[in-house]
């Protein structure tokens, strides 16, 4: 029984153009400056299976009857081996099974050399595990490489013993087939050698560009769709269409960036590279439309206003939701999301989008406002009350009635339009119904606080000037503080010196007083001694009890 490849289960309706909707009143919203710029389908995606592509990096040359020696091929082989050697060594380090006696980390039953990964995220470790798993099937991969080595077809599907589908891609074989095979017998060997060398050198340059980041660590840096496009060349769309088996437009898938590749293994013997292509699983939400809205300023009682509406909405089952799509991938025709980002909108805004313009909320604009015109679907939408709208072909000035919110200018009205200094070539006819009976003057408009851009700018300038003044005052006080601090320091030093001086003077005075006292004592002692010497009889009689010294 034939096994279908489990890589992708996709439910998709081919995008053929989405017409106007019933939930959003696009024609009526034009009166207040709301334009539907783009309508896209809503797609959900999740991680899917993987497909494997074998890239043959060396072409097969047709036989030359033994008369030609193609030296450029040998040089290419040597250079290519040098280029791929770091990749081969790195893949070997990641996939090497650590000895059971040493410390190991196991993921999904395989052993990953974590030292080769360094600091890795969960996704990067998952990629490394994929490399290890692929190397566990090295025998099947080698058999696969051998089976495609002799073919010179650009794309050939082969199935290994495990019934795993892989695609052998020889990106440069197309060049070889077209440039060499038909003329191998009619030109000189040197010319063929030079031609082959130029082709191989160009491809080497592309390979160097592709594998610049992978040389560091292929497990941590997946191949982008741009790298895959360079690597697989013109065969990429064929590979995708044959392998994905889906109605999803190939260009749409490629532009989404959701298709990535991972280098799994390299065969040095055959110079073949095994790449794992990761393709998400897609499913479309039937009947859902993601609509981009552009709101330009409109005229209301000779005042410039802008309506408050979301930038992007989701229309589904006659309901409207705000849909920013911040975590989604937006392509020209689809929005790819992992989950629904829709959120409710206010009732007044909902009624406004449904066509009840009296429920719309506007913000007055004072000053310059850049969103005064929009160019969508080949038609110009402009607020010609706030802009000078001049038609260059045929020459005339476009006037806008006071009751009209905006002016809609198609090719019937003007083929080349001048808005101030901008020039637009109008290419389409406006075929929607413009509700001319709606008057902005009679509308029951709910105003928010005015958005005065000029005053806001002046306020900002005043704040900046005030900040500069405060900074200048701060610097002045800081300088004053530094000056005062200096004076305080000098005063403190002077005070300390004064105290020291007073202490020294006090000590000197005390010393002088003590010295004078000692001098007085010395003088008294000297006088007593002198009197004793001059009157010895007095002291002798006195010593016997006769105080007067008379016998």
Curated annotation (Swiss-Prot):
This is Fusion glycoprotein F0. Keywords: Cleavage on pair of basic residues, Coiled coil, Disulfide bond, Fusion of virus membrane with host cell membrane, Fusion of virus membrane with host membrane, Glycoprotein, Host cell membrane, Host membrane, Membrane, Signal, Transmembrane, Transmembrane helix, Viral envelope protein, Viral penetration into host cytoplasm, Virion, Virus entry into host cell. Class I viral fusion protein. Under the current model, the protein has at least 3 conformational states: pre-fusion native state, pre-hairpin intermediate state, and post-fusion hairpin state. During viral and plasma cell membrane fusion, the heptad repeat (HR) regions assume a trimer-of-hairpins structure, positioning the fusion peptide in close proximity to the C-terminal region of the ectodomain. The formation of this structure appears to drive apposition and subsequent fusion of viral and plasma cell membranes. Its main location: virion. Residues 24-492 are extracellular. Residues 132-160, 456-481 form a coiled coil. One of its GO terms (cellular component) is viral envelope. Belongs to the paramyxoviruses fusion glycoprotein family. Pfam families: Fusion_gly (PF00523). Glycans are attached at residues 65, 69, 77, 90, 431, 461. The chain crosses the membrane at residues 493-513. It comes from Human parainfluenza 2 virus. The lineage of its organism: Viruses, Riboviria, Orthornavirae, Negarnaviricota, Haploviricotina.
